[in-house]
Amino acid sequence: MAVFGVTIALLVWVATLLIVSIWKQIYSSWNLPPGPFPLPILGNIFQLDLKNIPKSLTKLAERFGPVFTLHLGSKRIVVLHGYKAVKEVLLNHKNEFSGRGDIPVFQEYMNKGIIFNNGPTWKDVRRFSLSILRDYGMGKQGNEARIQREAHFLMEELKKTNGQPFDPTFLVGCAPFNVISDILFHKRFDYNDKTCLRLMSLFNENFYLLSTPWIQAYNNFENYLRYLPGSHRKIMKNASEIRQYTLAKAKEHLQSLDSSCPRDVTDCLLIEMEKEKDSQEPMYTMENISVTLADLFFAGTETTSTTLRYGLLILMKYPEVEEKLHEEIDRVIGPSRVPVFKDRLEMPYMDAVVHEIQRFISLIPSNLPHEATRDTMFRGYVIPKGTVVIPTLDSLLYDSQEFPDPEKFKPEHFLNENGKFKYSDHFKAFSAGKRVCVGEGLARMELFLLLTAILQHFNLKSLVDPKDIDLNPVTIGFGCVPPEFKLCVIPRS
């Protein structure tokens, strides 16, 4: 029996050596960037803190340099860290790394829509969607009027709180929700509308769940975890409900479609579908249109809503910053005039605060994953086709050479010695290149106009001492999720 046990142990030992030897040969078959040696099957999972992957990537960059390789499950991942490496990948090699890396929790939508599309249609769908958004006012007068109108409704809702504590998640979030809803569907909602609140709840829950450790594990070990219970199932269910809503809106629009007079983005997409009805391989199917609308709806609501909410918490933490903003607003706009986007040219401090909020919170710290579309030589290394590429945005936003004391909230990061707004090329909160956020122009306008309107009419009041406000996100993964909080808004006049 003892001999048998020794024999089994030797066989296991030999098998282990053989597996490691084969794995080493596979691992070293490409001239990849350096990185920690991966274990078979598990890869480098033990080098990552699933509760804070961006921090783990920063530590690995300190050890292996600005370009390094990780293996997670069967995935080969190349991470770019720092301004030069990230800019080089996103701008100088934008075509080679324009693919969308695999995100298993959204596998159903990988070849549809805009955000998660890695199929042959994404370039054309993205290009056409961007042109429609521009036609409907992105960065122009049309969207400014939409935001100003919605700001008025938001101010009325804030007045109804009568200085009592409230959670800003959905109340403030209704403003960007209604702006993008008007662009997509020519529809706005009352702030207590059940459909509006339900959709925002789905957006909010998915943003949170996508940032949890379980989903970080699931997206890298999907083959082993897909059949287990977990929050990946909830995300898929929520995404399906959102898409069912956008599909219903598309079908509703189709019943009253007038090709000569499109009312909104949905109509424009449906008109393209009508043009392709005789095509053997149509690009604009009802399924693709519904996913495209869901992508725009989620991204156009949740990122701006979360940034505004985080911004309010930050301003309560730093009342001296809020006071300076009140002074600038009173001087440039006054108590009653409606803010306009061009006011930012005369309001460098507000412009700096809006940028610093986005820098400080680093909402999507590790970016969405890119993918190499072909074998590519990069800095002397070969990055094979299909490799997942992570251009870390937080490595730019928290670069201590560009932003001294990056862990501190300092509007001065975006002000020169004369108090004028100072642009930084490190500010890539919306990413860059082929996959840059299609709603960047809209989001910039919303953040400036909505935050300015709130502070024009109200003082912010925290329920706790500002020194006790915790700005740390409750979870960090896909995004940085702010802690829940309540506040009071006190009318200024």
UniProtKB/Swiss-Prot annotation:
It comes from the Eukaryota. Substrate binds at residues 298-303. One of its GO terms (cellular component) is endoplasmic reticulum membrane. The keyword Repressor does not apply. The keyword Ligase does not apply. It is found in: Endoplasmic reticulum membrane; Microsome membrane; Mitochondrion inner membrane. PANTHER family: CYTOCHROME P450 2E1, CYTOCHROME P450 508A4-RELATED. A cytochrome P450 monooxygenase involved in the metabolism of fatty acids. Mechanistically, uses molecular oxygen inserting one oxygen atom into a substrate, and reducing the second into a water molecule, with two electrons provided by NADPH via cytochrome P450 reductase (NADPH--hemoprotein reductase). Catalyzes the hydroxylation of carbon-hydrogen bonds. Hydroxylates fatty acids specifically at the omega-1 position displaying the highest catalytic activity for saturated fatty acids. May be involved in the oxidative metabolism of xenobiotics. This is Cytochrome P450 2E1.
